[in-house]
Amino acid sequence: MELRRGGVGSQAAGRRMDGDCRDGGCGSKDAGSEDYENLPTSASVSTHMTAGAMAGILEHSIMYPVDSVKTRMQSLNPDPKARYTSIYGALKRIMHTEGFWRPLRGLNVMMMGAGPAHAMYFACYENMKRTLNDVFSHQGNSHLANGIAGSMATLLHDAVMNPAEVVKQRLQMYNSQHQSALSCIRTVWRTEGLGAFYRSYTTQLTMNIPFQSIHFITYEFLQEQVNPRRDYNPQSHIISGGLAGALAAAATTPLDVCKTLLNTQENMALSLANVSGRLSGMANAFRTVYQLNGLAGYFKGIQARVIYQMPSTAISWSVYEFFKYFLTKRQLENRTLY
């Protein structure tokens, strides 16, 4: 990651927080910021991957119970016992009726996917951003370059993450037939084949690319309002990122609902829609959602999705930025010593 002034303007939505500084100061002149400014102008690929992996694991681990509720609230034909009106009420009922640890079922497979997925995302994004910015803009920051870099990084991220999403969402559903991630993987592989793990991949990409575009535009606008000097300012990055992530999450909820349907293959819902076999394809998912619930169906779970996305983005950026700073500083100190 380049450490230059104007930093965060180049980040892709919801995935990173840039603390770049160059040519002098960035905000307050405490010891921490001075140390930050004295770091080398780029971090290694291993630093980006390690920091990204930590950010992904912590983000998904902390917010996983809310994600479990979101998945259930997006169900098109939920069991009467699994109809919820609020996140708090849902978590309380799930823990009371299904066990204290039930909201965490599937967390292990999510962590296994989030680590490598986020590691590849950050490493790919940082290196492509730097390369493409040199091509498109000699001034150092091109929105086109950042957008292309983010889109390419998303292809890698979702290729790793999609199978984990399929497994964890099936484990999260009410009355799931799967008791563990391993049994779910075996059952899906045996009954539906390898393609089932990527049935929602195109929908995932279709959702994430506009998500990042909306987040990027909103984030840049908010940064101009709260941090016009574009200094390294963790508070402004977290606030702007959280609000931008919330807007992007709300706008892309219809795509997320379709993705959930493709991942979970709700038998009751598909039966009501007269769908035989397995549902595949984003267009078919859109038609099925509308057939069952009308326009309102596209916004099922929007509250949970927004509440999930805001702190997730803040956690991801703050953790990534901390580990990037910490690891780069350690590498610099080791080179100085030896």
Swiss-Prot record:
Mitochondrial iron transporter that specifically mediates iron uptake in developing erythroid cells, thereby playing an essential role in heme biosynthesis. The lineage of its organism: Eukaryota, Metazoa, Chordata, Craniata, Vertebrata. Gene3D superfamilies: Mitochondrial carrier domain (1.50.40.10). It catalyses: Fe(2+)(in) = Fe(2+)(out). Signal peptide: none annotated. Interacts with ACB10; this interaction stabilizes SLC25A37 and enhances the function of SLC25A37 to import mitochondrial iron during erythroid differentiation. One of its GO terms (cellular component) is mitochondrial inner membrane. The chain crosses the membrane at residues 45-64, 106-125, 143-162, 200-219, 234-253, 301-320. InterPro entries: Mitochondrial_sb/sol_carrier, Mt_carrier_dom_sf. Solcar repeats lie at residues 43-131, 141-225, 232-326. GO terms for molecular function: ferrous iron transmembrane transporter activity; iron ion transmembrane transporter activity. Keywords: Ion transport, Iron, Iron transport, Membrane, Mitochondrion, Mitochondrion inner membrane, Repeat, Transmembrane, Transmembrane helix, Transport. It is found in: Mitochondrion inner membrane. It comes from Rattus norvegicus (Rat). This is Mitoferrin-1. GO terms for biological process: iron import into the mitochondrion; positive regulation of hemoglobin biosynthetic process.
